[in-house]
Amino acid sequence: MSNDGSDHSDDEEESFSMVREATNFFLDRRRDVYINSVLEHIGGFEKWSQLNNDCQRTVVKFLDYKSRCQLAICSKIDYDLVNSVPMNIHGIGFSEEYEHPSVKVCVEFEKNSNKKFELIFEQSLNDTEIKWTKYSNVLLPEKHCIVIENSKYYEESVKFVEKWMKKCCYGVSSVKVGMDNYPLETSHIKDLPNCRDVMLNLKNENSVRWWLNKMPHHMHDLHISPATFREHNEVTLSPDILTLPQITNCEKLYLYHKTNISNEQFFELKAKKCSFNSSNITDEAINKFIKNWINGKSVEGFKEAFLWQRSTSNTEEITKGIEIRPWNEQFQRENAKFWSDFSEYCYSGRCYQISSNINPYNSMTLNFINNCVSIHVTGLAKKKNGMPYTKYVSPKSYTFCNPIRL
């Protein structure tokens, strides 16, 4: 909820949710009806040759990968047609496996679905073995393997990634990169204009910069971490990387490398949710950040911030000039479920509730624990029978995963 004084009743919120679900349902139905009408018109491809090129391209655009392959082997003309229409691929992930030298590549056709395939590239003497498992609802999993003779597994995995990037005209929405030695100089990837969700598991800063520069300036979700979390203190991201628009404009920003984010850079971020090393951010800056939210001057839709690697944090300095309500025994009795959910989400330490000046029924939680200061919007203004009240909501209800504890 925004911090502008607006509020909705629980009934209204439930109605909004039902409308969204109904809208998505009918959009899917409309798409299915459209595809079925096309299939009926072409008579199960019996009238395929009667369609003009534009109609054929439209049909191919909606085909899944298996159907595209089946159509492509019908004729040379169909083969060229299929290859000329970009494939719908949601995301591509590729990463090195460090326990056993290999590269894992995953091609995801739809978001959060089983429509994907995963391959493992391994070296076997002078050859490359490509392994995958075929799953079935009724049969036992089948393991498959093909061999590319006189080849190197790393190079073959790169060729595969480049090939599939080209198949979708570099239009993926999600990318997960975990190959520090990816050959950037010879890559054909120039731009990934549709990418909104990015995970870079890299310790090479040049690789981080190279991949970020391929992304659009406004992204939804960005994770940058070393290859393993044991290495999170071994590499420090340079200040110039932290000023890239791909970072400053990102809605959800998670940085697990060491960073030297300054007070000024902290206030430049547009993130609604963020987590990063904040050893250079002063207590006075955190105080100002909280006051901005109290007075409705923070990032619109702000949800939470985890500020890590703070050797010392002065509670009095951070809360100076701010009215706070400690989470004492009375607060715990009044909000037992919320207290339990919050503690499960991020380990509650010394917690304080802070109300908004715009709408006092909106509030945030300030949490001090170990080497971290975390800030969460948890109190939402609601109405019941026309009477306003505060509904406390645990951050886990609006977060897709718990933050990594550095």
From Swiss-Prot:
Superkingdom of this protein's organism: Eukaryota
Parts of the chain that traverse the membrane: none
Coiled-coil segments: none
Signal peptide limits: none
Protein name: Uncharacterized protein K06H7.2
Source organism of this protein record: Caenorhabditis elegans
